[in-house]
């Protein structure tokens, strides 16, 4: 009987297989019948380059189908999974210092020094680490020629925010062995550094037969606010006051310093003034939550206040990222609806506020689900996730300081007073200059300045001669060329190059440079570096060159990693699902999260005059003197994207 069914299935699917591009035949053959049908739908839409032009409800259906396929075929575990060991969830109704015990079936999942997972299988590039030379790629294709910005869409607070998230999520453990890159003669005169030394990523045996070695994450992978709390007990002790649950913060609202002059915060490595400002803001948020909870529940002691406030503050950060930052990054009605559905479900905020979480993740959202969902793969962030978050082009060459004493002009615009080179805003210098500038002026200035665009030839030159720091925030002696290093890192960590990356993410690969971009100068330089071999194209270069979807500040290639991993950060975490309740957060704490909708709400709590006086835009992440978006009377699911 099974033979007959198999024959009938093959008879039905054979004609369909001929429609599918050959790149996907092996993947298609490995799929279940339902997944094959979903893939056919996705592939058909991809061939027509259509999904982002569909009415919103159809675009959401496409993204739901694609996300399902990625959840089935693009979540790959690295390392062993423990068997027969289970912790009691009731023993850990709080976020631990190192991220352990979130998953009762795998205590180490997402914790400090757990493995980075994979979205696609590793592609060994040991024999191609310098082909083409990373410094040639950086010089000819990445280095900034003329600054390109994002217009009014995305500002410097938005650029700072993503570094704030990176300091929460990811940092590879390094080896003790240094290696050196030297600039080839053809580009040496254009390279700020003729050579530079750096530490290799530390390879660690996994104890597993399929992927034998992997890389460890020095930060916790959970959305747990570790940028302000740290990723272990030692770091947490440094930031806590041990009074009323609070964290250390100076009287001027900026970060405190230790006896060595280093900042006191959860993660102190490689900061700049924008990151420091956000760390300080959310320490203020944590401390205000503590005050509020203490007033509401006088019997709560220091440890309980800290634990509840951390849960609340981490959830506020996750919510702001989900329904505010990402919505501005992917500025389309489809993604506005999609990101809000991640948090509130398709039934929407009003329904959820009234009736609670109803239905599964689609109708009710990931937040508040009855139990976490990891799709059978232990939670981690992935090597590919790290790669698509390489966004240093967002940073400009200078920060434009505004005169906050002047009377705001049209759209609350402010005159420019002076510009500070970005080199003076990183590390210890950045901390000193932030103190001189003052918090309000720093935030308002960042709010009024557009950030850089994620394009070819827009990587900051000043980042090609950069002083990196160690994990304690101390400057290292060897400067680095970060643009070249990022190319090397992807190859070193066996991340697939652009075309293979797309294939394995079920995206149609390019066959010629013209498929990637219409820019003739870019095509000329791509040929100069890679010849006509599109398979050699590095991932970062391809994502920078790729034609952008209207409204997207990132490439579609990067977005599909976002699609799966943004959902995963919420749905796999018990504190956003089964434990997202009054018992865990307290009634007042849960109310705090549920009534926070944006970064503007957070700013208004701590700097009540700031947004009212100087912000004209809808979001604190778009340029502040931009016009508010007009009301659209058409229900969002029935809107059609403007071409």
Curated annotation (Swiss-Prot):
<dbReference type="GO" id="GO:0020037">
    <property type="term" value="F:heme binding"/>
</dbReference>
<feature type="binding site">
    <location>
        <position position="224"/>
    </location>
    <ligand>
        <name>Ca(2+)</name>
    </ligand>
</feature>
<comment type="function">
    <text>Alpha-dioxygenase that catalyzes the primary oxygenation step of a variety of 14-20 carbon fatty acids, containing up to three unsaturated bonds, into their corresponding 2R-hydroperoxides. Involved in the production of oxylipins that function in cell signaling, wound healing, and protection from infection. The lipid-derived signaling pathway is involved in the initial response of hot pepper plants to pathogen infection.</text>
</comment>
<keyword id="KW-0349">Heme</keyword>
<feature type="binding site">
    <location>
        <position position="172"/>
    </location>
    <ligand>
        <name>heme b</name>
    </ligand>
</feature>
<dbReference type="GO" id="GO:0031408">
    <property type="term" value="P:oxylipin biosynthetic process"/>
</dbReference>
<dbReference type="GO" id="GO:0006979">
    <property type="term" value="P:response to oxidative stress"/>
</dbReference>
<feature type="binding site">
    <location>
        <position position="489"/>
    </location>
    <ligand>
        <name>heme b</name>
    </ligand>
</feature>
<keyword id="KW-0276">Fatty acid metabolism</keyword>
<feature type="binding site">
    <location>
        <position position="493"/>
    </location>
    <ligand>
        <name>heme b</name>
    </ligand>
</feature>
<dbReference type="Pfam" id="PF03098">
    <property type="entry name" value="An_peroxidase"/>
</dbReference>
<dbReference type="GO" id="GO:0006633">
    <property type="term" value="P:fatty acid biosynthetic process"/>
</dbReference>
<keyword id="KW-0575">Peroxidase</keyword>
<feature type="binding site">
    <location>
        <position position="222"/>
    </location>
    <ligand>
        <name>Ca(2+)</name>
    </ligand>
</feature>
<dbReference type="InterPro" id="IPR019791">
    <property type="entry name" value="Haem_peroxidase_animal"/>
</dbReference>
<feature type="binding site">
    <location>
        <position position="220"/>
    </location>
    <ligand>
        <name>Ca(2+)</name>
    </ligand>
</feature>
<dbReference type="GO" id="GO:0004601">
    <property type="term" value="F:peroxidase activity"/>
</dbReference>
<keyword id="KW-0443">Lipid metabolism</keyword>
<keyword id="KW-0925">Oxylipin biosynthesis</keyword>
<keyword id="KW-0223">Dioxygenase</keyword>
<protein>
    <recommendedName>
        <fullName>Alpha-dioxygenase 1</fullName>
    </recommendedName>
</protein>
<dbReference type="InterPro" id="IPR050783">
    <property type="entry name" value="Oxylipin_biosynth_metab"/>
</dbReference>
<keyword id="KW-0444">Lipid biosynthesis</keyword>
<dbReference type="InterPro" id="IPR037120">
    <property type="entry name" value="Haem_peroxidase_sf_animal"/>
</dbReference>
<dbReference type="GO" id="GO:0016702">
    <property type="term" value="F:oxidoreductase activity, acting on single donors with incorporation of molecular oxygen, incorporation of two atoms of oxygen"/>
</dbReference>
<keyword id="KW-0611">Plant defense</keyword>
<dbReference type="InterPro" id="IPR034815">
    <property type="entry name" value="A_dioxygenase"/>
</dbReference>
<feature type="site" description="Transition state stabilizer">
    <location>
        <position position="269"/>
    </location>
</feature>
<comment type="similarity">
    <text>Belongs to the peroxidase family.</text>
</comment>
<feature type="binding site">
    <location>
        <position position="168"/>
    </location>
    <ligand>
        <name>Ca(2+)</name>
    </ligand>
</feature>
<keyword id="KW-0560">Oxidoreductase</keyword>
<dbReference type="GO" id="GO:0046872">
    <property type="term" value="F:metal ion binding"/>
</dbReference>
<dbReference type="GO" id="GO:0006952">
    <property type="term" value="P:defense response"/>
</dbReference>
<keyword id="KW-0275">Fatty acid biosynthesis</keyword>
<feature type="binding site">
    <location>
        <position position="226"/>
    </location>
    <ligand>
        <name>Ca(2+)</name>
    </ligand>
</feature>
<dbReference type="InterPro" id="IPR010255">
    <property type="entry name" value="Haem_peroxidase_sf"/>
</dbReference>
<keyword id="KW-0106">Calcium</keyword>
<feature type="active site" description="Proton acceptor">
    <location>
        <position position="167"/>
    </location>
</feature>
<keyword id="KW-0408">Iron</keyword>
<feature type="binding site" description="axial binding residue">
    <location>
        <position position="392"/>
    </location>
    <ligand>
        <name>heme b</name>
    </ligand>
</feature>
<keyword id="KW-0479">Metal-binding</keyword>
